[in-house]
Amino acid sequence: MTKAPSQLRVIPPHVPAHLVFDFDIYADARVGSDVHQTYSAAIADAPDVFWAPQNGGHWMVQRMDAISAIATDPEHFSVREMQIPRVPNPPFFIPLSLDPPENLPYRRAMAPMFGPVAVKAMEPRLRAWAGEIIDAALQKGTFDFMADVAKVFPVSVFMELMGMDLSRLHEFRDLAERFFENQNDAAQIEALSGQILGVMKALIDEKRSTPDDKLMSHFIQADMGGGRTMSEDEILAMSFVLFLGGMDTVTNVTGFAYQQLAQMPDLQARLMADAEGLSGAFADEAVRMFGVVNTPRLVVKDIDLMGVPFREGDMVLNLLPIGSRDDRKFDQPHVLDIDRKKVAHVTFSTGPHLCIGHVLGRAEIKVLTEEWFKRVQSFSLAADKPRPFRTGTVMALEALPVSVNAAS
């Protein structure tokens, strides 16, 4: 029987034996529902940069300085392919699949809708949504925080921002989940990409006929310089990455953070007593500790860096969530400490591909936490309930059953 790509061990001749460390990013048995802690422990004895022979073979980068060096060197490490293992027709994302300076006009087109001023203006609506969603969940007593809160709130925000039909939330959320669940299946990725592009094409057609003040209409009308507007293919490629990011990233950061918070009654009491004063610090620490995106790069020019022979055609995976827990940069990196002095991390990447939505993501977690502790006195993990998870290029907590004591 032919082995699946994840089972075959691929070690090219240029990879030194001392840099080889077995790890399957999609299904490593050492990783559990406390994904970040167990993931870090599983590779603790690996080199700072190591070759994982599974999934076609690729480099993995776990230290913050090394991640930053690769993320800021597009001459050698390109974003034009972002699938591990490599696939024949990789999805094309704008601006993620463009190296600088080609990505810059698109980032400029997006920036006004995601900057601090725009996000601040959204806050009343964020707060209203969060309250409605939490109130509905609390009626159940014991419920799945992921299904009833974390998979609803950020996705609602994204869909409203884009001008999408909120009644299709669960349909669109399911599409995004299946895309990330099948990262090592080229045929599934191609089929699901086609479905997502079909959704976005329909939205483009709708907004051309009936423009509004939402993000899709902004893309259609955006001046890219010299009076040029984006082609439909450009808008589709940009919308594709926003669809995936908006449906999955903040959802899972929030889920992992609340899984940890459910086990910290003392911190819950502090947030209950002063959510408005402490929610910003909680959001900052949640983002540092519970990043979910690992960013691939394709080596396009040979380079020896940090004692590692990167060769053209190699795939590289920057482990952003692990880099943000680098014990050379953070004291007690696996402890959720809202009193920690705010310091730089790489959860949102760095350099030319710093996540455009990082201000909005932080605001969503902050507002949700304030509204949660207006209504919740304490909560805990529901006993003996499984907490399934997903790893890969985007990590996810798929269920988080909790028991809640509502505030009086």
Locate each region found by the language model.
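Cytochrome P450
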Residues: 1-408
